[in-house]
Amino acid sequence: MTAILERRESTSLWGRFCNWITSTENRLYIGWFGVLMIPTLLTATSVFIIAFIAAPPVDIDGIREPVSGSLLYGNNIISGAIIPTSAAIGLHFYPIWEAASVDEWLYNGGPYELIVLHFLLGVACYMGREWELSFRLGMRPWIAVAYSAPVAAATAVFLIYPIGQGSFSDGMPLGISGTFNFMIVFQAEHNILMHPFHMLGVAGVFGGSLFSAMHGSLVTSSLIRETTENESANEGYKFGQEEETYNIVAAHGYFGRLIFQYASFNNSRSLHFLLAAWPVVGIWFTALGISTMAFNLNGFNFNQSVVDSQGRVINTWADIINRANLGMEVMHERNAHNFPLDLAAVEAPSTNG
């Protein structure tokens, strides 16, 4: 009998680190994208928590009228927010070392830019990490593709829109009421409700919710019975069992009779493709809509489009929305300008004398 002894090659520290980073045996997969994701998301989360609790007021409009957003300065969970970086900073990269002092950095809303840029980098890396893990497990890449929809939406709101408007002060505040304020002002300035891409996004989100509820309820209801008629069907199953617990043919038959035959799927892959693609495509369109409106390619304007034979305007719903938009535009940034931009753009009549 011949024994062959091979000398085991010693792996370098870097090699062991690489193997650990890319190992799919870890409880949580790290991956090369995770190397960047972990510090960026930890930074964004830490600064968000600290700033939400204790950040001083921020001069958001650049007119020396600071706005308070933190809990220690009089806000609650609903009204609190990370106030966007000052209009005085605009789109300038504004790290701590660019300010004369930390107080100046806080006054100009530096934490907002820090949080947003780290957050966007972190979620982009999370998407890459999803692809990386799928690749190493021999899976297809569609999980990362689906996640690209919320990543695109966040990027549109926090980065593309401020770029188009010329200042990070136009970005969405990081808080509950700040989000609603952003939505109201966005409608006032861009008429987003009349934008086709927003309509597609609404159809995607609401339709996706409906399809998800229908699918979950059908799967839960169409069980493969393992018990007699005198026992509960639930008694025939154990939570987490490997055996299939529902019958897609039964679900197909039920739904086909409930609506019509071709409204239901008898192919599981086709069904789940629709469940994934519908909301993802809708949110893609919403992100695209935000990105186009960032550069003032706004929603449809049908103001005063219906007139009678005498030329008098017959108000439509579009005119009602327009008046609401003007009212909302008047209310926001009330000390930064005296009139809505739509009215301020009109030339004043010339006077002789």
UniProtKB/Swiss-Prot annotation:
Enzyme class, broadest EC rank: oxidoreductase
Ligand binding (chlorophyll a ChlzD1): H118
CDD domains: Photosystem-II_D1 (cd09289)
Modified residues (N-acetylthreonine): T2
Name of the featured protein: Photosystem II protein D1
Residues annotated as binding Fe cation: H215, H272
Main location: plastid
Reaction(s) catalysed by this chain's protein: 2 a plastoquinone + 4 hnu + 2 H2O = 2 a plastoquinol + O2
Site, Tyrosine radical intermediate: residue positions: Y161
List of residues binding pheophytin a: Y126
Stabilizes free radical intermediate (site feature) positions: H190
Organism of origin: Dioscorea elephantipes
Record-annotated membrane-spanning stretches: 29-46, 118-133, 142-156, 197-218, 274-288
Note: 2 of the reaction center chlorophylls (ChlD1 and ChlD2) are entirely coordinated by water.
Family: Belongs to the reaction center PufL/M/PsbA/D family.
Co-factor: note: The D1/D2 heterodimer binds P680, chlorophylls that are the primary electron donor of PSII, and subsequent electron acceptors. It shares a non-heme iron and each subunit binds pheophytin, quinone, additional chlorophylls, carotenoids and lipids. D1 provides most of the ligands for the Mn4-Ca-O5 cluster of the oxygen-evolving complex (OEC). There is also a Cl(-1) ion associated with D1 and D2, which is required for oxygen evolution. The PSII complex binds additional chlorophylls, carotenoids and specific lipids.
One GO molecular-function entry: iron ion binding
Post-translational modification: Tyr-161 forms a radical intermediate that is referred to as redox-active TyrZ, YZ or Y-Z. C-terminally processed by CTPA; processing is essential to allow assembly of the oxygen-evolving complex and thus photosynthetic growth.
Localization per record: Plastid, Chloroplast thylakoid membrane
Keyword field: Acetylation, Calcium, Chlorophyll, Chloroplast, Chromophore, Electron transport, Herbicide resistance, Iron, Magnesium, Manganese, Membrane, Metal-binding, Oxidoreductase, Phosphoprotein, Photosynthesis, Photosystem II, Plastid, Thylakoid, Transmembrane, Transmembrane helix, Transport
Residues that coordinate or bind a quinone: H215, S264, F265
Free-text function comment from the UniProt entry: Photosystem II (PSII) is a light-driven water:plastoquinone oxidoreductase that uses light energy to abstract electrons from H(2)O, generating O(2) and a proton gradient subsequently used for ATP formation. It consists of a core antenna complex that captures photons, and an electron transfer chain that converts photonic excitation into a charge separation. The D1/D2 (PsbA/PsbD) reaction center heterodimer binds P680, the primary electron donor of PSII as well as several subsequent electron acceptors.
Family matches, as NCBIfam families: psbA
Propeptide positions: 345-353
Gene: psbA
HAMAP family: PSII_PsbA_D1
